[in-house]
Amino acid sequence: MRHGKAHRKLGRTSAHRTAMFANMSASLIKHEQIVTTLPKAKELRPFVEKLVTLAKRGDLHARRQAISHVRDVEQVGKLFAVLGPRYKDRNGGYIRVLKAGYRHGDNAPMAVIEFVDRDPAEKGKDSGPVAEAAFAEA
């Protein structure tokens, strides 16, 4: 019987899942919209919703709790400075998951996960030092 099994394993160890959700949530906070597989998007949504609720609280303990989950201090700064105040009057439902067809190659169902009142200017910004290093080598 499948009682009490609340989350998907996604074919990963628990440490890999935790790291993956930390990285994906940092990317989502940075770009405010990312494309991933549908099961990952559905599992990421409650993770990020809880982070936004922490940001709405705004105290030091909430910030430290968010850093322990995301592990990217710069993105936690944006979470508390931009996203927390943006959603201060909204009671949950900060994230939307839209189905985006199927991936070529393995036919995996894809999804776009984004913030509800996102800033369109954030889309397509650099993805950090990795992208800058790739351009420097070329």
Swiss-Prot record:
The keyword Ribosomal protein applies. Belongs to the bacterial ribosomal protein bL17 family. GO terms for biological process: translation. This is Large ribosomal subunit protein bL17. It comes from Phenylobacterium zucineum (strain HLK1). GO terms for cellular component: cytosolic large ribosomal subunit. Part of the 50S ribosomal subunit. Contacts protein L32. GO terms for molecular function: structural constituent of ribosome. The gene is rplQ. Keywords: Ribonucleoprotein, Ribosomal protein. It holds the Pfam family Ribosomal_L17. It comes from the Bacteria.
